[in-house]
Regions:
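Active-site phosphate-binding and catalytic loops of NTP-dependent enzymes
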Residues: 298-302, 306, 376
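Intracellular alpha-helical coupling/juxtamembrane segments of multi-pass membrane proteins
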Residues: 246-289, 293-300
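Alpha-helical segments in transporter systems
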Residues: 126-127, 275-278, 285-288, 306-314
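ABC ATP-binding cassette signature C-motif
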Residues: 1-258, 309, 313-414
Length: 414
């Protein structure tokens, strides 16, 4: 029996349909990669499959009783929750009991705690958890937190972007899902975590639909590729390499068919312009066919071309871009940068790598002057024009129109 069926689905924002009577079926054990251009509707489709978003028309059927995990592209978490509380929050009605049991257990270890009151509450919680047979949920939550190398007592608000992504994956996997929906699961993850996630998904019997732009991840994990292209879903068995070969042929066939259609339409347009009124009356069927051809051509959505982007170098800066001298930075007891020195010069292209939570973003902010070092000095060069794209895109005004963000104060982009 299928785990999921999407039937005759339509969804539009504005005048362009993201889904145009789309069809999709997910069978047990499949790992389907959902691909397509940015903005084509992949995340909207995944939200609809997860029951987090509504379709304009059509339906989503899920196997009754199926356990489902969903990880959105930017998971929303309460920053005041602990990692353990955030993970068990996805476990339904027992989540509050488990979170309180975890909190009371830790409170008993605090100096000056009211042991008698806390012990009474702990016994009451134990009884409720036993009545709901919920101990397996706690052990599963602890196992998955450990597998993702997270501190169960850490506050969500203190986590790095990569650690928050690990947390979202842990929350989804803690319910041992039959169906897993993942939107950009490799975003913010370090190289080791991506490789670990690949092995986890490949070895799992769970049915998976995932969105990613990571080609290696696509090739290793997927058993089927589904492309969302101009509102329709094109399915291709196998991995991304197999899909690329098939897609090239599909695009060639489409181009040939469109060229034939356009040539025939042009011939009919010539005929209708040259024909006298009497001929049009005798050939009413041909006139009606031409009108239908015009409607079909107007409805056809041609494939978008590739973006051509040229970056201006701007005003030439000094040779020195930034210099850090014996810089150190800590957060509480955790040392992130220790006695670090470097010099960045004009034209350098540097890749900064390291495990999640190691301090890569902190180092960038130290270089930019957004953070002050605890020790040492950080200075920027002269005549710099800095473009900073942070992982959470906080520099973007989400209420502004797109044209105002890309080209403020101008009516066009050159």
């Amino acid at each position: 029996m299928p785990h999921l069926i999407l039937s005759d689905a339509s969804l539009a924002f504005g005048h362009v349909p993201l889904l145009d009577h789309a069809e999709f079926q997910l069978d047990p054990g499949e790992r389907v990669a959902l691909i397509g251009r940015n903005g084509c509707g992949k995340s909207s489709l995944l939200r609809a499959l997860a029951g987090q978003g509504a379709l304009d028309d059509g339906s989503v059927w899920r196997q009754p009783g199926i356990r489902m995990g969903y990880v959105p592209q930017e998971p929303p978490f309460d920053p005041e929750l602990s990692v353990f509380e955030a993970v068990v929050a996805g476990m339904g009605e027992v989540s509050a009991l488990l979170a309180e049991y975890h909190a009371v257990s830790h409170a008993m270890a605090e100096p000056g705690a009211d042991q008698a009151t806390l012990l009474d509450r702990l016994h009451a919680l134990q009884g409720e958890l036993e009545a709901r047979q919920a101990w397996s949920f706690e052990s599963q939550a602890e196992r998955v937190i450990q597998r993702f190398s997270l501190d169960p007592d850490a506050r969500v608000g203190t986590l790095s972007g990569g650690q928050k992504k690990r947390l979202a994956l842990a929350q989804a996997l803690a319910v041992t899902p039959d169906l897993l929906l993942l939107d950009e699961p490799t975003n913010h993850l370090d190289i080791g975590a991506i490789e670990w996630l690949e092995e986890l998904l490949i070895g799992s019997p769970t049915s998976i639909v995932f969105i990613t732009h990571d080609r290696r991840f696509l090739d290793r994990v997927s058993t089927r590729i589904v492309e969302l292209d101009r509102g329709r879903l094109l399915s291709c068995p196998g991995n991304f390499s197999a899909y690329q070969a098939k897609k090239e042929q599909i695009l060639h066939d489409e181009a040939v068919a469109n060229a034939k259609f356009d040539k025939f339409l042009a011939q009919e347009e010539v005929w209708i312009r040259k024909g006298v009124e009497a001929r049009r009356t005798r050939n009413e069927g041909r006139v009606l066919r031409l009108e239908q051809l015009r409607r079909e051509r107007a409805a056809r959505r041609d494939r978008q071309g590739k973006v051509e982007l040229a970056l201006d170098s701007g005003e030439k800066s000094g040779k020195l871009v930034a210099e850090l001298t014996h810089v150190s930075k800590s957060f509480g007891d955790k040392g992130v940068v220790r006695d670090f020195s470097c010099r960045l010069q004009r034209g350098d292209k540097i890749g900064l790598i390291g495990p999640n939570g190691a301090g890569k973003t902190t180092l960038l902010r130290l270089i930019l002057g957004e953070l002050a070092p605890d020790a040492g000095t950080a200075r920027l060069g002269t005549r710099l024009q800095v473009a900073y794209f942070d992982q959470f895109r906080t520099q973007l005004d989400e209420e502004a129109a797109l044209v105002d963000v890309i080209s403020p104060g101008s009516d066009y982009v050159e």
